[in-house]
Amino acid sequence: MKHLLTAADLSRDDATAILDNADRFREALVGREVKKLPTLRGRTIITMFYENSTRTRVSFEVAGKWMSADVINVSASGSSVAKGESLRDTALTLRAAGADALIIRHPASGAPQQLAAWTLDEHGGPSVINAGDGTHEHPTQALLDALTIRQRLGSVEGKRVVIVGDVLHSRVARSNVALLHTLGAEVVLVAPPTLLPVGVTEWPVTVSHELDAELPLADAVLMLRVQAERMNGGFFPSSREYSVRYGLSEKRQSTLADHAVVLHPGPMLRGMEIAYSVADSSQSAVLQQVSNGVHVRMAVLFHLLVGSEEEAISA
């Protein structure tokens, strides 16, 4: 496997191997005074973030450094992009500089696929990892969500996962639907009709507009942020009405099964899609997701750049 561009790129075996190795990396780092493994020593990883990010950017950087890679961060404002350089020329420059992996977040859907095509050479070119492209996909987020569900519930297969909120603009939802289906989960989308994409009836999901009917049946609930920055208005009457209909309040949380887990990809709009008390409750796995993000991204880098399970943990 050369690139990770969409969650659909992952077979069940690939996804399971990445989740298993994420757990192995986590266990290998427990108790270490210096959190360093030699797995990617001598490799160069370049992150290219053209949209704001905290969790994804930091976790990729930490993942690379914990594996002893050289990690270089490139942003639009601090590079020749600010002078008008195209993404293609930037990509070719970074390939020529010797990058082993390019990790890209970009507002344009399909940018990672273009990057992979542009940087292909007689040696194969660098591996490209999609860290979020427009409203299209965010495959490593889906992997860390699946890992969190597996850790909390024992497995993903057969679990009922309810995804709530702004599905229309959510790359997280698209990647989660694909990966959770691959891993054998049942996926339910809950959203107002205006926040569901055209063609959603063709997805391997059940669609509902009634959150209260779905929560008691859920093993996991993934709350999505309303992405106002991608909207022109008119998708729902008001923030208050949205919260009343689709927010995970403390009262709604009480209808969840005791074993159910609450997830959120962040950043959270506390008080809108999720109540303060719910976000901080024992059922919430938000911080566990962040921690898992580092280990999953270590496993993804390993899977693409090394590939041999026997060498995953050394020294």
UniProtKB/Swiss-Prot annotation:
Query: Which residues are carbamoyl phosphate-binding?
Result: 55-56, 105, 138, 141, 266-267
Output the Gene Ontology cellular-component terms: cytosol
- GO molecular function terms attached to this record: amino acid binding; aspartate carbamoyltransferase activity
Q: Does the keyword Endoplasmic reticulum apply?
A: no
Q: In which pathway does it act?
A: Pyrimidine metabolism; UMP biosynthesis via de novo pathway; (S)-dihydroorotate from bicarbonate: step 2/3
Which keywords appear in this protein's UniProt record, sorted alphabetically? Pyrimidine biosynthesis, Transferase
Q: What EC number(s) does the entry state?
A: 2.1.3.2
Q: Which domain of life is it from?
A: Bacteria
Looking up InterPro entries in the UniProt record yields: Asp/Orn_carbamoyltranf_P-bd (IPR006132), Asp/Orn_carbamoylTrfase (IPR006130), Asp/Orn_carbamoylTrfase_sf (IPR036901), Asp_carbamoyltransf (IPR002082), Asp_carbamoyltransf_Asp/Orn-bd (IPR006131)
Gene Ontology terms describing biological process: 'de novo' pyrimidine nucleobase biosynthetic process; 'de novo' UMP biosynthetic process; amino acid metabolic process
Which chemical reaction does it catalyze? carbamoyl phosphate + L-aspartate = N-carbamoyl-L-aspartate + phosphate + H(+)
HAMAP family assigned to the protein according to its UniProt record, in alphabetical order: Asp_carb_tr
Q: What is this protein called?
A: Aspartate carbamoyltransferase catalytic subunit
Q: What are the top taxonomic ranks of the organism?
A: Bacteria, Bacillati, Actinomycetota, Actinomycetes, Mycobacteriales
